[in-house]
């Protein structure tokens, strides 16, 4: 059920006494009303499973874990607000002949450019059909042909038709189904407009944690109630990071504004292991519209359906870069488009669908058709202006095959995690199935050990002392924009040693400014998101500098060749 928490009354002794609720109180004996700072109210809650995030990963885990104990879902916006809702193309699984597991495995390994964990790839591919069946049983409707078989699509990097989809709104269909199921599950509590600030570890008991600290444990999280303005100490036996991606570290992204890398940043600050952050996937084709954020995704399935990329001169340029043409993997297509734009000085390239059947386009891609039509583009007659946009993080919180991080009692699933499936580049439509497989496995694993876990009662409440209202919001908003500009200009599709060095120097200045501001300011969503984006940006830069080669999604003009193929 959805929770609406009312503020608790407080009673403090001192010069007179304080009495009252949320933001104001009566100072007895003085006869005046004194305004209390937001986030003054103290509250503790306990739950077996604390799930941070409400996309396919978080909601699927919650539904499975509810069989083992009480689940609390924390999401910083509405329950349905997630990256999942924006996924258009589909979800990949072997569902018909002549496709088979070995072909899907091979396609995934090729896309991952020598960096995939083959054991993980095999596990996900082989379990994928069962997880698809789970979604179907929950009520997700995938498109079928007239003969009743599934209407499987083919996307870049896939050698067979294996993409199940619901029109071009697959993510939205999955999210809607899961949201309804979660709302009707009595063992799940939902906390909307609640922002996870930090995960709780031995650090909050006074220990000094370093990377080599033995057996770091997670005991829950500090969570800000954004509506009632208080910080809740959530104590949990199991904590699950399902916070999605971090696309908003860049100026142009297909991600919604909530994608600020919160989970990755929290785990990094808690000394968890983060890996492969240099591998940021830029979707090759977002609709070119400088005044709109997030960028509207022009699904890869359109190219699978037959759409062709052209430069401003009308040339089908992709064959110059890869024999697969417009159906090459995303990293190749994104770099090709980026090069064409820079070579000709253009703001975008074209995606041409005009040679395709108009009725078929409208039927298979109603979302793209309607969205473009609203902007004066009839995709059955007009070329679509497209540009690459930050889309997906292949790196994240390192986990094992059950979704466990190196921090005990802490799991990570979905885009926030790094499982080894994607390697240096994600194969199209492999993200939703990864989330479904790992949320299932994480729920089974954590549920099986729940009885041996206890709450850590010694965790102190949030300390607001020494903080006051944010001095000037402009300090946050301008730094937010500056981080995005630094990352876009210097740490984008094509990188160099000099660009990365400059990005690091400038980001360090912003980091120091924001940390000082954070420590003396009351909690706000924006300052926390900026803090997380700075951490994530630093991780991308650091790992990009360490990679002295070009591989997958990481391309450096100073190190254009690939070195060893070791994982």
Annotate each language-model stretch with its function.
Residues 13-16, 20, 28-29:
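Glycine-biased, low-complexity coil/linker segments
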Residues 43-47, 64, 78-80, 87-92, ...:
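Glycine- and aromatic-enriched mobile tails/lids
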Residues 49-73:
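N-terminal Rossmann-like FAD-binding beta1-loop-alpha1 element of flavoenzymes
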Residues 67-88, 97:
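Glycine-rich FAD pyrophosphate-binding loop
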Residues 93-124:
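Glycine-rich active-site loop/strand segments that organize a redox cofactor
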Residues 116-129, 162-180, 191, 253-261, ...:
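Short beta-strand to alpha-helix junction loop
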Residues 137-230, 235, 242, 286-289:
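Conserved redox-cofactor binding core of oxidoreductases
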Residues 266, 272-384, 436, 445-451:
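An anion/pyrophosphate-binding glycine-rich loop and adjacent beta-alpha core
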């Amino acid at each position: 059920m959805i929770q609406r928490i009312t503020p608790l009354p407080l009673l403090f002794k001192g010069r007179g006494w304080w009495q009252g609720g949320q933001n104001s109180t009566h100072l007895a004996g003085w006869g005046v009303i004194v305004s209390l700072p937001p986030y003054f109210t103290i509250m503790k809650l306990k739950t077996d499973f604390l799930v941070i995030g409400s996309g396919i990963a978080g909601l699927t885990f919650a539904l499975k874990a509810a069989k083992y104990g009480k689940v609390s879902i924390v999401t910083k916006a509405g329950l349905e607000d997630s990256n999942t809702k924006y996924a258009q193309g589909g979800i990949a699984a072997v569902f018909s002949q002549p496709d088979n597991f070995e072909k899907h495995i091979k396609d995934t390994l090729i896309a991952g450019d020598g960096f995939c964990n083959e054991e993980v790839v095999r596990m996900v591919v082989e379990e994928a059909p069962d997880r698809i069946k789970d979604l179907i049983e929950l009520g997700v409707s995938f498109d079928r042909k007239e003969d009743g078989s599934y209407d499987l699509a083919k996307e870049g990097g896939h050698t067979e038709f294996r993409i199940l989809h619901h029109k071009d709104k697959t993510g939205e269909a999955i999210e809607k189904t899961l949201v309804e199921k979660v709302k009707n599950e009595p063992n799940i509590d939902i906390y909307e407009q609640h922002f996870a600030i930090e995960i709780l570890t031995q650090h909050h008991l006074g220990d000094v944690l370093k990377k080599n600290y033995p057996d770091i444990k997670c005991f829950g999280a500090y969570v800000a109630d954004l509506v009632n303005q208080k910080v809740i100490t959530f104590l949990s036996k199991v904590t699950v990071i399902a916070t999605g991606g971090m696309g908003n570290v860049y100026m142009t992204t297909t991600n919604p504004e909530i994608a600020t890398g919160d989970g990755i940043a929290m785990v990094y600050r808690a000394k968890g292991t983060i890996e492969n952050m240099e591998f940021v996937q830029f979707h090759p084709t977002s609709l070119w519209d400088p005044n709109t954020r997030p960028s509207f995704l022009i699904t890869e399935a359109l190219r699978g359906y037959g759409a062709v990329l052209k430069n401003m001169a009308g040339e089908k340029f992709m064959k110059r870069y890869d024999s697969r043409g417009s159906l090459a993997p995303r990293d190749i297509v994104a770099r090709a488009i980026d090069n064409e734009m820079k070579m000709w000085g253009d703001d975008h390239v074209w995606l041409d669908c005009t040679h395709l059947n108009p009725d078929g386009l409208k039927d298979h891609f109603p979302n793209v058709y309607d969205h473009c039509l609203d902007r004066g583009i009839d995709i059955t007659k007009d070329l679509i202006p497209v540009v690459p946009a930050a889309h997906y993080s292949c790196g994240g919180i390192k986990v094992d095959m059950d979704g466990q991080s190196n921090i005990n009692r802490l799991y990570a699933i979905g885009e926030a995690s790094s499982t080894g499936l994607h390697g240096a580049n994600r194969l199209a439509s492999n993200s939703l199935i990864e989330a479904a497989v790992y949320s299932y496995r994480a729920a089974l694993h954590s549920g099986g050990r729940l009885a041996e876990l206890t709450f850590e009662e010694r965790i102190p409440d949030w300390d607001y002392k020494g903080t006051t209202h944010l001095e000037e919001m402009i300090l946050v908003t301008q730094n937010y924009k500056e981080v995005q500009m630094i990352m876009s200009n210097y740490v984008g599709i094509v990188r160099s040693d000099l660009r990365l060095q400059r990005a690091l120097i400038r980001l360090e200045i912003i980091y120091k400014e924001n940390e000082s501001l954070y420590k003396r300011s009351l909690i706000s969503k924006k300052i926390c998101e900026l803090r997380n984006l700075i951490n994530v940006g630093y991780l991308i830069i650091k790992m990009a500098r360490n990679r002295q080669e070009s591989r997958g999604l990481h391309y450096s003009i100073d190190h254009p060749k690939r070195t060893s193929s070791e994982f």
